[in-house]
């Protein structure tokens, strides 16, 4: 049986995307995304719980993020979990689990009119060979 590695998130950017262009002018954007769940505890009190996710977008999606996304933007991200490892300057092994997005829908309302759920996806959501284990 094959495994399934699929993540779907709706949340707000915690800061403006950090966009870098790697060798070959390949864009990569990285940003924190907050998702908040609200539920009632046993006493009926509303509780909000926020989780932070690191999102990575490649190529065209990175360029869209750079152009249109900013701190507070509401987005739908679909992608895969990816855990990468590297050694820091002191030789310590570090790990990071990230959501590598391959589908992005901007859910913010436009300032000049109705909501504009602009959808963008890529079949190239994977990291680029040679770059996936670097600290970006």
Q: Predicted segments — roles?
A:
Residues 9-49, 85, 95:
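Core FKBP-type peptidyl-prolyl cis-trans isomerase
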Residues 14, 20, 58, 82, ...:
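Conserved positions in beta-strands of structured domains
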Residues 11-13, 33, 71-82, 101-104:
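OB-fold and OB-like beta-barrel modules that bind single-stranded nucleic acids
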Residues 55-94:
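Beta-rich strand-turn-strand
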Residues 1-3, 21-24, 44-45, 92, ...:
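Acidic, gly/ser/pro-rich intrinsically disordered tails
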Residues 89-106:
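OB-fold/S1-family single-stranded nucleic acid-binding modules
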Residues 51-53:
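Short amphipathic alpha-helical segments
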């Amino acid at each position: 049986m094959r495994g399934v590695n699929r993540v779907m998130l709706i949340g707000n950017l915690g800061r403006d995307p950090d966009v870098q262009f790697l060798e070959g002018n390949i864009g990569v954007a990285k940003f924190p995304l907050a998702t908040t769940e609200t539920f009632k505890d046993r006493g009926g009190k509303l509780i909000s719980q926020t989780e932070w996710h690191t999102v990575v977008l490649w190529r065209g999606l990175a360029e869209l993020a750079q152009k249109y996304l900013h701190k507070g933007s509401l987005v739908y991200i679909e992608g895969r979990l990816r855990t990468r490892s590297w050694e820091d300057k002191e030789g310590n092994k570090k790990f990071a689990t990230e959501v590598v997005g391959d589908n992005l829908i901007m859910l913010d309302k436009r300032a000049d009119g109705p909501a504009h759920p602009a959808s963008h996806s890529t079949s190239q959501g994977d990291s680029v060979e040679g770059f996936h284990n670097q600290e970006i």
